Amino acid sequence: MTVLETHAAILARAFATTGLIDPLPEPVVADDAAAAGLQAAAISALGSPIAGWKIGATSAEAQAIMATTVPFYGPVFADRLWEDGAEIALPQGFRGFECEFALRLGADLPRREGGYRADQLAIAVDAVVPAIELVATRQRLAGM
């Protein structure tokens, strides 16, 4: 197993069990390509159906906090969506809540050369709904 596959399996197990892990022993995300590779491997290791995607660090302030200069994206897993009124156990590493706008698409937007214009994206949106994200870390941090 490669270092990347090992780290992906560790992250997937922590996510699946809502447990905390010690910080990963070796850096594997030296650049965007390595981070994307780790994310893809962890998603594959989880094996959970993906219900949608989220974006983060969409403002300069959020990017400064996250030590990045660009927004990033990640999957929203189907087994992590709850309807209004659901009782949810807070995971270890819980850090807080974030209020979000969730966009429900009326049709898939397949990846394509050149991407999409804003007007093409707007007509693909079926609904805008409120959402609440439970923010949690998977790594044991100082004071946790």
PLM regions: where:
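Catalytic-core "active-site belt" of small-molecule-metabolizing enzymes
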Residues: 2-144
